[in-house]
Amino acid sequence: MLKTYQKLLAMGIFLIVLCSGNAAFAATNQVGGLSNVGFFHDYLIEPFSALLKGVAGLFHGEYGLSIILVTIIVRIVVLPLFVNQFKKQRIFQEKMAVIKPQVDSIQVKLKKTKDPEKQKELQMEMMKLYQEHNINPLAMGCLPMLIQSPIMIGLYYAIRSTPEIASHSFLWFSLGQSDILMSLSAGIMYFVQAYIAQKLSAKYSAVPQNPAAQQSAKLMVFIFPVMMTIFSLNVPAALPLYWFTSGLFLTVQNIVLQMTHHKSKKTAALTESVK
C-alpha cells in the first residue's frame, strides 16, 4: 500500500511538471522562453542551466552529451536518498513479514465487526503490535521523494529554458524539435524500468503482495510509459533524452540495490548458520 501511494505521488508530480511544461512549450514552441524570475529560477534552474552550458563547453558544444552527463551527475547526487529509502523499505518489509499472521488476524476481525468500540480496540491492538516490533509505517513516508523532486524538476526546466540547446543536434535528431524515435525510446525505457522494478520487487520482497496490489502494479507498468510517450511527442527531443537517461540510470540502480541487498542477506544468513 505504501509503495502504491509513493508511485501515485511520483505520477502526480510528473503530471504537474509535464502539464505546466507543455503549456510553456505551446506558448513558445521551442526550448527556452520560460520566466526568468523567482526563487526557483535563481537557485535551481539557472545553476543547472549554467552547468549544462559548462559541460557542453567541455565537449565542443555537444549539448546532447551534456544532458546525459548532467542527468547522471544529478542522479548520483540524489542516490543516497534512494539508498536510504530502499533500506528502510526492506527493513519495514522484513518486520511486517514477521507479524503478518497477527496483522491478517486483526484485519479480518476489523472487517467483521461493526461495533465502533470493538473497532477502536482492534486498532489499538494493531498499534500495540507495531510498537512491540518497533514498526512505524509513518517513518517510511515520502520525504526523500519530496526532497529530490525540486532538484529533478529544476533540471527539467533548465533543459527547457536553456536557449542554446534548441539550436544543437545530437545523434540523428535536433534537440529543439520533437522526434518520434526519441519519444518512443523514452517510453520504452520507462516500460523496461517499471517492468524490471515490479519483477525484482516480487522476487525479493519479504511480504507477498495481495492480488489487488499486484494488479495495480501491472497496470502502472503500462500506463506510465504510454503517458511518457504521449508527452514526449509534444516536447523538444532534449527532454525525452533526459527522461531516457534518467530511466536507464534508475533501472541499473534498482537492479544493483536489489541484488546487493539480497546478497548481503544471504551472507548474513550463512554467517549466522555457521555460528
From Swiss-Prot:
Keywords: Cell membrane, Chaperone, Lipoprotein, Membrane, Palmitate, Protein transport, Signal, Transmembrane, Transmembrane helix, Transport. One of its GO terms (cellular component) is plasma membrane. It comes from Bacillus subtilis (strain 168). Residues 1-18 form the signal peptide. GO terms for molecular function: membrane insertase activity. The lineage of its organism: Bacteria, Bacillati, Bacillota, Bacilli, Bacillales. This is Membrane protein insertase MisCB. Required for the insertion and/or proper folding and/or complex formation of integral membrane proteins into the membrane. Involved in integration of membrane proteins that insert both dependently and independently of the Sec translocase complex, as well as at least some lipoproteins. Also involved in protein secretion processes. It has an overlapping, although partly distinct, function compared to SpoIIIJ(MisCB). A lipid is attached at residue 19 (N-palmitoyl cysteine). Pfam families: 60KD_IMP (PF02096).
